[in-house]
């Protein structure tokens, strides 16, 4: 995966596992929908039908954003993924991938049908289901990715985020000061971060994964493979219009004076199977109020409603950092305007943007830089940065360092590199599914 090559790995945390897990979830949703339909779609099961539709849409969304290119002007030509709407009744069925445009149209249809049916009253543990706010947060993210040439999608992002955030978003954001005040040792901060009772967490999902063993700075693997001083300079140790790293409520983990980087947010839990054998799993907040706020800020920016965008950015930074100064559109613009664009030799947080839509130089671009920077901090090691890289056509490099000296650039992924769509699992291709194209 590091080399952007196809992997034959089929174990936990592989593309194969993600593909299977998503389609298993889709199969469950389709079975529920079929059973409800067989009963005549009674009103008493409307909420369950709504959640099944949202679950089906979400799992196809995960697959599309992983194995397809970002939605854009070529979406009607780019390869999609099979959108399954019925329970499977045959062995080894053959499906067409369709196009990205068709996948997004189907997701939108499922969302719009399912959203008004969601009813939180049917759940005993609301945060472990696609409750109303979680469903609308998903809709906000989806329509942000479903970019239209005239940005008509952005008003839907705003409308749906408003349902999540209400009239005073600040009261629903994570209490980062309280999280940062907790001990960074043991699992105290991560357990608090994923707590379903936290007001910011809208949907908490469990997943069979060893990812926290790599991403948690409490483990040596993080420093070696995931986050070090070089990468931290662009994320958890970076400076923004809110100040330097000392302004963050949650500081990079540094027990015993040893160098550690990254915020402690995810932790691995062990489920013992037999003897000393165990399976790792994790909990993570798939949707949060903070992320919904940044979705809205980005939509405001694309619509050139800069004062409203700056107000959302300011609300986020006052929760996430210790900075008490109000950020205006002017202060945000000035900060990112003076930064140089990233190069492998001189990295900065400001990357050249090459989206499949038009953004203006100056205020609009610099507000986008700020939002991408904030989202990178907010969702560090949770996977959303990759979506921003794809959506904004950010060029990324594979760099070889000796100590802190850049020795060589071993690979480069350009804006239109087909490897931005991760290759389908080898077993899926062997079974007859059309693979993603490659240049070699």
Language-model segments: residues:
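Hydrophobic-face positions in mid-chain alpha helices that act as interaction patches
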Residues: 154-290, 323-358, 378, 384, ...
């Amino acid at each position: 995966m590091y080399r952007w090559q196809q992997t034959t790995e089929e174990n936990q945390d592989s593309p194969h596992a993600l593909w299977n897990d998503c389609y298993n979830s889709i199969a469950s949703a389709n079975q529920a929908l079929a059973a409800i339909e067989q009963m005549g779609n009674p009103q008493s099961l409307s909420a369950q039908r709504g959640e099944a539709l949202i679950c089906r849409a979400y799992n196809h969304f995960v697959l599309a954003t992983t194995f397809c290119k970002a939605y854009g002007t070529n979406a009607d030509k780019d390869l999609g993924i099979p959108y399954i709407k019925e329970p499977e009744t045959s062995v080894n069925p053959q499906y067409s991938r369709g196009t990205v445009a068709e996948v997004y149209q189907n997701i939108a249809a499922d969302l719009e049908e399912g959203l008004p049916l969601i009813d939180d009253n049917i759940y005993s543990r609301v945060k472990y289901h696609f409750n109303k706010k979680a469903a609308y947060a998903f809709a906000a993210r989806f329509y942000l990715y479903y970019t239209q040439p005239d940005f008509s999608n952005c008003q839907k992002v705003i409308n749906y985020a408003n349902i999540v955030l209400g009239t005073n978003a600040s009261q629903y954001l994570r209490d980062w000061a309280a999280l940062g005040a907790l001990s960074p040792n043991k699992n105290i901060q991560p357990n608090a971060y994923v707590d379903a009772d936290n007001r910011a967490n809208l949907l908490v999902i469990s997943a069979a994964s060893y990812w926290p063993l790599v991403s948690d700075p409490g483990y040596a693997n993080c420093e070696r493979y995931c986050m070090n001083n070089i990468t931290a300079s662009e994320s958890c140790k970076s400076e923004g219009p809110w100040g330097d790293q000392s302004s963050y409520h949650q500081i990079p983990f540094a027990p015993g004076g040893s160098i550690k980087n990254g915020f402690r947010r995810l932790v691995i839990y062990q489920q013992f199977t037999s003897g000393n054998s165990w399976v790792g799993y994790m909990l993570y907040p798939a949707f949060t109020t903070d992320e919904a706020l940044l979705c809205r800020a980005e939509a405001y920016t694309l619509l050139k409603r800069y004062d409203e965008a700056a107000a959302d950015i300011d609300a986020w930074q006052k929760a996430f950092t210790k900075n008490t100064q109000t950020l205006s559109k002017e202060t945000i613009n000035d900060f990112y305007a003076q930064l140089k664009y990233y190069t492998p030799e001189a990295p900065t947080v400001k990357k050249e943007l090459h989206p499949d839509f038009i953004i203006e130089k100056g205020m609009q671009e610099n507000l986008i830089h700020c939002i991408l920077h904030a989202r990178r901090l907010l969702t560090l090691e949770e996977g959303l940065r990759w979506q921003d890289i794809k959506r904004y056509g950010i060029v990324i490099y594979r760099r070889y360092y000796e100590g802190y000296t850049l020795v060589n650039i071993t690979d480069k992924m350009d804006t239109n590199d087909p490897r931005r769509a991760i290759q389908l699992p080898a077993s899926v291709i062997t079974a007859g599914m059309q693979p993603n194209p490659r240049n070699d």
